[in-house]
């Protein structure tokens, strides 16, 4: 079957930002103007298309990355409510992502599979902590983007302040290509710095847009920002640079081509403005998606590994062998949905694909594309497409689907570690099986949600990215799986590590009491690893002193010992083990004996290597009026916080600090009472840091039952 729309007219984009910047409203307007919906939904009314989970509609926040397909034809610059005569339709796949830090994995997995991003910023709040997190995630995957400064109709709106923040805090080469005409309740339109026109809105529903001369009182400002635009685009191309230095005018086509080149190369970040809620600037933003964000053909080929470890590239081409990345799992009444991005080749309904990550064959029984909760069945997904496969059994987030005769494994996703855990149990014994099924289903969907059983207490422990994250998952158990659960108090996800290296530590397991005995013997070196490496194992066994079949079990024993640590029962991380020697017995040695020997060696070595306790540190930003600043800072210090910076703007102080997560439980209530309800804060995971000795002693004693 031929492709309906050629790849150069396809855009895979995400809409990402800080919570409350207006992402979901912006998406709704895009869907309205592109004809997917015929009535605009509002977040505050709980009837938006992309927020389709019950909790999303109740809370007014986006939790899961909803994927939607729509289409857009470039507007006529002289008649902006109508398509440009002769312009061709483009297909746009949109992912609306959450802005709440507890759901950061949804942003992470979206960035991994997108070609471009619209970053929505609030014209009042500007760059917020979660904006910086989203920006870093986009940087990690080198995703081209532009900025839409939203809510220009709100009191306190300031486009130029946001422009400065983007350059200073995000260190981005932001280039405004539009300026607002007016602000707050006088917002009446936008100036297009590329076409040098003013678009003035006759109403708040986006159906009456007039093209006018640029207002006389803006002439100087427009010339200043037009000059910045021309300078920025000239630097993308030697020919344009020559024209610029020669004092020649650049044509509109040259400016657009250079802007596209700079945006795709991530050297320019265009800035647009408007008000999604008041329907101002949305059509122009959609034109910018077509003009400046890349098609699948514009991005570099995806890199992967062949089974022998050789690096290979796959480009966006239907004729190449299939390669697709699973980026999201979702439980659904129709069956388990596995969302995929097809990077090359064609994924066909009724065919078989190899899950190269697990080396298992999967049958592709049904393929669908989504319009939020509408599912449209399709026969195939081609290179550059986003869609979902129904009913895959062994494929999870980060796995690669390919053909058996051309296997490849694509780079997976970065999955952050959980920072908070709680014990959970069903309210009635009858619900035990249902709870187990619910936890399995939810952990398959969300790789940052972990479930394990505490070996000592036999309690089921769930771990996640924050209190809201776990609260919503428990809520989903009740709604979707009809399981009522009791949840314990939140616990901090402490970790253990070591501070010095130790060499030649032995682990000997010997049981010889007549008959077949047990014998395993290993010698290891243990040293601190790089932060974030977890557990690293190297074997330097030579000459067969330990047979190959026993090295794996010894490593497994060490890994399992790391899971329960050596000082307080928390996982031991960022260690490098080198197995240097050992011995075996022809009759008595076994895999189990070497597994136990490995565990004994690791425990002995870690106890000698100056083990320490680590705790998650959170980046906390508090905004408060000056009257309460002293109380807030005193409180942060009392919570073992480290104040990093303070800014004051318009009578509001912003305090940035790093505070241990253990000290932040209940902070939302405390700050409300300390500031009479006028203080706000945001918190996100920063890093792990060593726990002060006096605090560590209390935690260790408590875990040993001595507290």
UniProtKB/Swiss-Prot annotation:
Family listed: Belongs to the TRAFAC class translation factor GTPase superfamily. Classic translation factor GTPase family. EF-G/EF-2 subfamily.
Gene, per the UniProt record: fusA
Annotated signal sequence range: none
Source species of the chain: Gloeobacter violaceus (strain ATCC 29082 / PCC 7421)
Source species taxonomy: Bacteria, Bacillati, Cyanobacteriota, Cyanophyceae, Gloeobacterales
Compartments where found: Cytoplasm
Chain ranges of the tr-type G domain: 8-297
Pfam families xrefs: EFG_C, EFG_III, EFG_IV, GTP_EFTU, GTP_EFTU_D2
NCBIfam families (alphabetical): EF-G, PRK12740.1-5, small_GTP
Keywords: Cytoplasm, Elongation factor, GTP-binding, Nucleotide-binding, Protein biosynthesis
PROSITE patterns: G_TR_1, G_TR_2
Binding site for GTP: 17-24, 96-100, 150-153
Protein name: Elongation factor G
An MF annotation (GO) of this entry: translation elongation factor activity
SUPFAM superfamilies: EF-G C-terminal domain-like, P-loop containing nucleoside triphosphate hydrolases, Ribosomal protein S5 domain 2-like, Translation proteins
Entry function: Catalyzes the GTP-dependent ribosomal translocation step during translation elongation. During this step, the ribosome changes from the pre-translocational (PRE) to the post-translocational (POST) state as the newly formed A-site-bound peptidyl-tRNA and P-site-bound deacylated tRNA move to the P and E sites, respectively. Catalyzes the coordinated movement of the two tRNA molecules, the mRNA and conformational changes in the ribosome.
Annotated SMART domains: EFG_C, EFG_IV
Gene Ontology biological process: ribosome disassembly
One of the record's GO cellular component terms: cytoplasm
